[in-house]
Amino acid sequence: MDVTSTLSLGDPLEPARKATADMLRSRDHSFSLPQPFYCDQRLFEIDMQEIFHKEWLIAGMTCEIPAKGNFLTLQIGKNPVLVIRGAEGQVHAFHNVCRHRGSRLCVSEKGKVAKLVCPYHQWTYELDGRLLFAGTEMGADFDMKEYGLKPIQVKTAGGYIFISLAENPPAIDDFLATLEHYMEPYDMENAKVAVQTTIREAANWKLVIENNRECYHCNGSHPELLKTLLEWDDVTDPRASQAFKDQVAACTSAWEAEKIPYAHASFGLRNRIVRMPLLDGTVSMTMDGKQGSKKLMGRIKNPDLGSMRILHLPHSWNHCMGDHLIVFTVWPISAQETLVTTKWLVHKDAVEGVDYDVARLREVWDATNDQDRRLAEENQRGINSDAYQPGPYSKTYEFGVINFLDWYSERMLNNLGEESAHVRKVAGS
């Protein structure tokens, strides 16, 4: 039986889609975006449809669902999503929507179930999404095989769970193979989330990412972070000093000896992995630069691994140190509202209060996240002004922002079915 609705109300966003494409084609790539990209709810809806519903997103970590029936849930725009560990250890992802009358199946953020049971009318699903029970009153012609949960594309690599709401998402396997290699020393199946926070920022999601993609603001805003973080992006950073390059050379020799991957690996503008030293004499992103967890990750023996930085557009950045990892994900709520989730991961056998102290582990990035929240919110308030007009980026300090917006512009035009504008290459790309 075909239950798909044939009613079409048309696309009320069509005029806004055309205007969006026109603005992207004509924008100066060395300047910030026109005001509607940060303020307009219609453009936000287009962002959700063409970016967050079509690209690969990090849903969580495999260690968060270690056993059969463990699940986690998340919200992508209007779409509730369920990620669950199957009977044979597979990771499945589904729309968290019962096929009976549409109720959410799982309402908690995390949990464990034997079967997926809708709380409304107790329709019951296997962990692989098959409908097992729908009561006894659905009629003789009811075919349970037609009413399994709607699946979502899912891939795993290096302990990360990637999902896409698209039927045909962009290619990502080359990046995932590299990520798997770079994450091997961490043995992420034997990790755990020590603590997780979510903050709400009164700013457009792109402002949150733009702020992350540069450290032009760091000296004036992030005293805690700069106790350990070197501002330079990598040795190709136009600001990089010879002393920094010498430090990188010394560190890479030690990393090679321990078979720790470190080389810069890029996959277009969407993905990047690189290991960079921390400030000389520090080994972890803590207030004193000492280990945040006494028990090191995976097979790691030397805590002095700097920070392996992982970028995944549109919404994630990561710092992987010898003793713990920090995973950041950005989730748009509205045109001027964004959630930022931060997860600190340690070895699964590390004992709270013995091997690590949660307050100490999170102290640097609690402060940094709050500082970045204020910066993004003030940026948003200014952009809302009638006086706002796009301003120029520094190719020396803000090339990461330029790269992000070039990626965003190209993906938007591509997903809107428009010809992409020429993307200029800049230092650090």
Curated annotation (Swiss-Prot):
Inactivation phenotype: Mutant is unable to grow on choline or glycine betaine as a sole carbon source, but it can grow on dimethylglycine. The gbcA-gbcB double mutant cannot grow on choline or glycine betaine as a sole carbon or nitrogen source, but it can grow in minimal medium with glucose or pyruvate as the sole carbon source.
UniProt binding sites for Fe cation: 217, 222
Coiled-coil segments on the chain, per record: none
InterPro entries the UniProt entry points to: Rieske_2Fe-2S, Rieske_2Fe-2S_sf, Ring_hydroxy_dOase_asu_C_dom, Rng_hydr_dOase-A
Catalytic activity line of the entry: glycine betaine + NADH + O2 + H(+) = N,N-dimethylglycine + formaldehyde + NAD(+) + H2O
The record's free-text note on cofactor binding: Binds 1 [2Fe-2S] cluster per subunit. Binds 1 Fe cation per subunit.
PROSITE patterns according to UniProt: RIESKE
Induction data: Transcriptionally regulated by GbdR. Expression is induced by growth on glycine betaine or dimethylglycine, but not by growth on pyruvate or sarcosine.
Top EC class for this record: oxidoreductase
Residues reported to bind [2Fe-2S] cluster: 98, 100, 118, 121
Cofactor(s) named in the record: [2Fe-2S] cluster; Fe cation
Ranges of residues in domain Rieske: 56-163
Biological role stated in the UniProt entry: Involved in degradation of glycine betaine. Part of a Rieske-type oxygenase system that catalyzes the conversion of glycine betaine (GB) to dimethylglycine (DMG). This subunit is the terminal oxygenase component of the system.
Subunit structure: The system is composed of an oxygenase subunit (GbcA) and a reductase subunit (GbcB).
Name of the protein in question: Glycine betaine monooxygenase oxygenase subunit
